[in-house]
From Swiss-Prot:
One of its GO terms (cellular component) is bacterial nucleoid. The gene is recO. Involved in DNA repair and RecF pathway recombination. This is DNA repair protein RecO. It comes from the Bacteria. Belongs to the RecO family. NCBIfam families: reco (TIGR00613). One of its GO terms (biological process) is DNA recombination. It comes from Mycobacterium leprae (strain TN). The lineage of its organism: Bacteria, Bacillati, Actinomycetota, Actinomycetes, Mycobacteriales. Keywords: DNA damage, DNA recombination, DNA repair. Signal peptide: none annotated.
């Protein structure tokens, strides 16, 4: 089969044998691709650090039966350096990479919108001009939108009655009106759902004015909504959540998420 080229974001890697690695790539035109980088762990490897997580590359690959083979790599963007040099940025970026891999779907299924969103979000994290927690929640909300899982925030998830509505129920699909509100719904403080809507829509002026208590509550709802749809917990989110401890909120995001998930499991 013929060689092909594609722009790719390195999501993760793991060792293969004594000198090789398998890399997982989110490509612009071919979706999720897993490929072998031969000799990458050798000191004089031609790939260097260009196949580390967060690297954004122009890759040439040879199609294989189970795994493709990386034959050439050219760096496109150097934002990886700014991300891995700071723990907060690194953990935020790791959560984005894990989410991208979970939402990309089957291998080789084109996911250009998710690819573009993820690269843009990582660039924003590297720039450091906006709060990391807001960037992560905005990314998760928009990524869920691409997957068809975005929570209803401005209308009732069940009857589509325009909001705003006070209650939120993950299994129902987001905000719910007083008539559709299931048992076990949570009632976020006023302004939390508006913050989530601002993050989804890119209204950074509104989002950055939200108090930290609202931002923490919104993070819990976003994480719970995503993981309910994934039917599994993201391994990287607890690491990100530890960075919020300095704000001394009354309850940790992890506790809120666990409580919300238990409510939805109990209430269907």
């Amino acid at each position: 089969m013929r060689l092909y080229r594609d722009w790719a974001l390195v999501l993760r890697q793991h060792n293969l044998g004594e000198a090789d690695r398998i890399v997982t790539l989110l490509t612009r035109d071919h979706g999720l691709v897993r490929a072998v980088a031969k000799g990458v762990r050798r000191t004089r490897s031609k790939f260097g650090a260009r196949l580390e997580p967060f690297a954004y590359i122009d890759a040439q690959l040879h199609p294989g039966r189970n795994l493709d083979i990386v034959t050439q790599v050219v760096s496109i963007d150097a934002f990886a350096t700014d991300i891995v040099s700071d723990y907060g940025r690194y953990t935020c970026g790791c959560a984005m990479l894990e989410t991208a891999e979970r939402l990309a779907g089957e291998e080789r299924a084109p996911a250009p919108t998710l690819h573009r969103l993820t690269v843009s979000a990582l660039r924003a994290v590297a720039d450091g001009n906006r709060p990391r927690d807001l960037l992560l929640d905005a990314y998760l909300l928009r990524a869920m939108g691409i997957a068809g899982w975005a929570p209803a925030l401005t209308a009732c998830a069940r009857c589509a009655t325009p909001g705003p509505h006070r209650a939120f129920h993950i299994a129902a699909g987001g905000s719910v009106c007083v008539h559709c509100r299931p048992a076990g719904s949570t009632t976020p403080p006023r302004g939390v759902l508006e913050l989530m809507s601002a993050l989804h829509d890119g209204d950074w002026g509104t989002a950055q004015q939200a108090p930290q208590s609202h931002r923490s509550y919104a993070s819990g709802l976003v994480a719970a909504h995503l993981q309910w749809h994934l039917e599994r917990q993201l391994k990287t989110l607890p690491l990100v959540e530890r960075t919020h401890q300095a704000y001394q909120v009354d309850r940790s995001i992890a506790e809120r998420r666990a409580a919300l998930v238990r409510q939805d499991m109990a209430c269907g």
